[in-house]
């Protein structure tokens, strides 16, 4: 699943080809995604794009009339291609702009979404989202206060978008390992020092992943078709039974919240 670094990579890749250009039309081949493609998007024509931003794992295309909200789902990707490019089986949406290019959305599992809103402040999917992990709002004191009375496994807590957005499975695993904290530790038992370490590590891991163009494990490609290279730097994620890069012991895995979790039992003691 594309996580925050992958979505940020996509945003940076597509922005130069879309910002300040005009949407000529939107071609929708498969309107039934996770949610049906918004009718306003299907009929959108001759509208200027004024900006592109990101909120959590959502791409936001700002136009003169409203906002296109895109989510890549489990296997989606976006890329910029010439308007005469051949269409692949899973190319479901084209946003055609007046520079000879188009934004093409590909999604084999069709679990993404492309929606429309005229008011971001009232957009229902954004109302309960926590702070951005790279923002000043996400800090040690915030995490400490948010974790009090939370008898939840720490990894599950960090992946809760109401706590902080965009810390997905890969980056939660990596951050906890670097900090030496067991993924099953109860959130309420975090110390202030651990919160300080976790916040700084999460920010550092995400920034490094963005620089590397995200993590390619299966479906994700950058907008230019290249893979993300952060997978080459993963310390524990996907490395079950391999030696721990810190102590040489064996990396173990377990299921937490229906997601695979990877950790070193020697370096990440539960408590």
Swiss-Prot record:
Residues in FPG-type zinc fingers:
235-269
- The UniProt entry annotates the active site at 2-3, 57, 259
Cofactor(s) in the UniProt record: Zn(2+)
Q: Where does DNA bind?
A: 90, 109, 150
Q: Which domain of life is it from?
A: Bacteria
Q: List the disulfide bonds.
A: none
Q: Which SMART domains match?
A: Fapy_DNA_glyco, H2TH
On whether Protein transport is a keyword of this UniProt record, the answer is no
InterPro entries named in the record? DNA_glyclase/AP_lyase_DNA-bd, DNA_glyclase_Znf_dom_DNA_BS, Formamido-pyr_DNA_Glyclase, FPG_cat, MutM-like_N-ter, Ribosomal_uS13-like_H2TH, Znf_DNA_glyclase/AP_lyase, Znf_FPG/IleRS
Can you name one GO molecular function term for this protein? 8-oxo-7,8-dihydroguanine DNA N-glycosylase activity
| Parts of the chain that traverse the membrane | none
Q: Which Gene3D superfamilies match?
A: 1.10.8.50, MutM-like, N-terminal
What does the cofactor field's note say? Binds 1 zinc ion per subunit.
Q: What reaction does this catalyse?
A: Hydrolysis of DNA containing ring-opened 7-methylguanine residues, releasing 2,6-diamino-4-hydroxy-5-(N-methyl)formamidopyrimidine; 2'-deoxyribonucleotide-(2'-deoxyribose 5'-phosphate)-2'-deoxyribonucleotide-DNA = a 3'-end 2'-deoxyribonucleotide-(2,3-dehydro-2,3-deoxyribose 5'-phosphate)-DNA + a 5'-end 5'-phospho-2'-deoxyribonucleoside-DNA + H(+)
* The family this protein is said to belong to: Belongs to the FPG family.
Can you name this protein?
Answer: Formamidopyrimidine-DNA glycosylase
Tell me the organism: Haemophilus influenzae (strain 86-028NP)
What is the taxonomic lineage of the source species?
Bacteria, Pseudomonadati, Pseudomonadota, Gammaproteobacteria, Pasteurellales
